[in-house]
Each structure stands twice: as C-alpha cells, then as structure tokens.
C-alpha cells in the first residue's frame, strides 16, 4: 500500500514538456510597475486596464459576459506559446495567441476559473509574463475583482 502511494505521488510530480511551468518570480520582493488600474463598463461586459505612469496600457482583463469568459492581455513584440499569470497563491501558464494588429498576447479563461479568484484576492501584487521578457508586476486592486464578478453575474 505504501509503495502504491509513493508511486502515485512520484508520478504526479512528473511534468510533461507541454505542462512544465517556469517558476514565477517572488511577488513578495518584486516591485510593481508604477501606474494605476481603471475599470470601464463595455457593451459586452467590463474591462480593467493597468496603465503605467506614461498612460500606456500594460495589462487588461476583459469580461465577455455573454460568453462568460475573461481575456487577459498584455503588450508583446511577437508570438509566444504561453502567457504566464501568477498571484500570491496561484500561477499558471495559459495558452496564448498573438494579435499582430494590436501587438497583444492574449489568453482566455472561463469566468469560473479559480485563477481569477487568485488574481482578485492576491496579497498585494499580480504578475503576467512572457518567456524571454521581464515580467509585468502590478498591484492587485479592486478593479480585477470587479471584472471577475461582472462576468459571473
């Protein structure tokens, strides 16, 4: 019985190359990019946007209420397979797509995804990263939770 339990635990910790995740940065020591969050109602839901001090949008969470999905996006210079998203309690590499017209890397989650709760209730900071670039760390403000709740209503 102990052998089966040990074998099961060992097998569960082996990650395939498709699911391997880079370790997220330590949010407790990462300084957030100076800026501010803004919440805006949209025709199809709502959106929270994080602007740097120059007024450039750096991170978006957009609710499509009819589809019950939340799209997370950040500027990117090219395509990447994953958008790494993390909070103080959870992290995940999300399959991403690149839109060359807007130069954004986007990932989509269902409104019920627990990662959205982790972002909404993160202790102080959240992050979004693209392999080969510096991670974007932003403060966790109420605008994030508002978008999540709008999508679940």
Where are the language model's segments positioned?
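Internal interaction segment
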Residues: 21-22, 91-153
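Positively charged n-region of N-terminal signal peptides that target proteins for export
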Residues: 1-4
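Short polybasic amphipathic segments
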Residues: 48-49, 82-84, 125-128
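Extended low-complexity, serine/threonine- and proline-enriched intrinsically disordered segments
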Residues: 80-92
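Bacterial N-terminal signal peptides
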Residues: 6-16
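Sterically constrained small-residue positions within well-ordered secondary structures
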Residues: 11-13, 52, 63, 98, ...
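N-terminal secretory signal peptides
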Residues: 20-81
